[in-house]
Amino acid sequence: MKIPAALVFIPVGVLFLISGLIVNIIQLVFFIIVRPFSRSLYRRINKNVAELLWLQLIWLFDWWACIKINLYVDAETLELIGKEHALVLSNHRSDIDWLIGWVMAQRVGCLGSSLAIMKKEAKYLPIIGWSMWFSDYIFLERSWAKDENTLKAGFKRLEDFPMTFWLALFVEGTRFTQEKLEAAQEYASIRSLPSPRNVLIPRTKGFVSAVSEIRSFVPAIYDCTLTVHNNQPTPTLLRMFSGQSSEINLQMRRHKMSELPETDDGIAQWCQDLFITKDAQLEKYFTKDVFSDLEVHQINRPIKPLIVVIIWLGFLVFGGFKLLQWLSIVASWKIILLFVFFLVIATITMQILIQSSESQRSTPAKRPLQEQLISA
């Protein structure tokens, strides 16, 4: 069912803003009073607190937009996911690839302990960015001189992580668009690299740093290749708010970290070869409608996100009822104006989150930066 997204903005915006601020405040309190004494206990508490917010987006994906995921994976990998630390390496084709990762993490019980390496602007996003900062996400400035130490410090903090975690890394550095593809093809021509058709050229320095620093305590890399099912609309947050469904094909392959090369150049080449393989796989799918030779599994939607949203909604309705009772007693133009201002803030917050996810607003491909991050 497709409905005008504007009709959903205000109620969902109010719900997300109120619940998000509550979650952020709780995170702040535990960050101040627990983390200085026990980082392990803080992380366990924060996992459950953060999920109270993040599950609302899972609900939007699963229950409101009813987006379907076809998971292609072998039996051995399916048995291990969610039971071991992993570095998740994926291509970056849509505005909600990060949310697809959250959906998969939620299915295997590690949503609240899922992590990612992101651009620093993300941590300033209202509600969601703040929750990520409290959850040990690693934020980069896209300047290797500054980011090298940031990455090493971030990886060091993960050594004693008390729960199974997934660390996501989008090595293409930006979302796939036709404009960025053309820039990548031009760069490939200059550097005598294979010309990509369906992926961008990976920026390998961050990946090399990750493998070098975490291979002693992270046993696996989950190699994810995803794309929208043929003839389905590309999912976006705006389309999700409209209740517009879609279908995602996701392949997961597990690589043992111990089997990766030991040298930096070898690790970088391994990453580049991996994306050449992804490119060929996607080309085969787009031309022959054959996505993967692995067994496909249907990912059923869980009940937990729905329960969390219902509880938050009940809290909001009860609070709104009490507010209306209070307004009927002390009603004045100032109070009414304050109420309207709050609704406007909720709407603006949702608009900021939606715009921040749009591929048109992501960082454009820059060959000088790419040249810094791709090993020669």
UniProtKB/Swiss-Prot annotation:
Swiss-Prot/TrEMBL keywords: Acyltransferase, Lipid biosynthesis, Lipid metabolism, Membrane, Phospholipid biosynthesis, Phospholipid metabolism, Transferase, Transmembrane, Transmembrane helix
Recorded catalytic activity of this chain's protein: a 1-acyl-sn-glycero-3-phosphate + an acyl-CoA = a 1,2-diacyl-sn-glycero-3-phosphate + CoA
Position of sequence motif HXXXXD motif: 92-97
Family: Belongs to the 1-acyl-sn-glycerol-3-phosphate acyltransferase family.
Keyword Aminoacyl-tRNA synthetase: no
Pathway of action: Phospholipid metabolism; CDP-diacylglycerol biosynthesis; CDP-diacylglycerol from sn-glycerol 3-phosphate: step 2/3
Enzyme Commission numbers on file: 2.3.1.51
Protein name per the record: 1-acyl-sn-glycerol-3-phosphate acyltransferase 3
Bilayer topology: Multi-pass membrane protein
One GO CC term on file: membrane
Domain comment in the entry: The HXXXXD motif is essential for acyltransferase activity and may constitute the binding site for the phosphate moiety of the glycerol-3-phosphate.
Species for this entry: Arabidopsis thaliana
Coiled-coil residue spans: none
Distribution of this protein across tissues and organs: Predominantly expressed in pollen.
InterPro entries xrefs: Acyltransf_C, Plipid/glycerol_acylTrfase
BP GO annotations: CDP-diacylglycerol biosynthetic process
Role noted for this protein: Converts lysophosphatidic acid (LPA) into phosphatidic acid by incorporating acyl moiety at the 2 position. Has preference for C-18-CoA substrates compared to C-16-CoA substrates.
Molecular function in Gene Ontology: 1-acylglycerol-3-phosphate O-acyltransferase activity
Residue spans crossing the bilayer: 14-34, 49-69, 98-118, 306-326, 335-355
Subcellular localization(s) per the UniProt record: Membrane
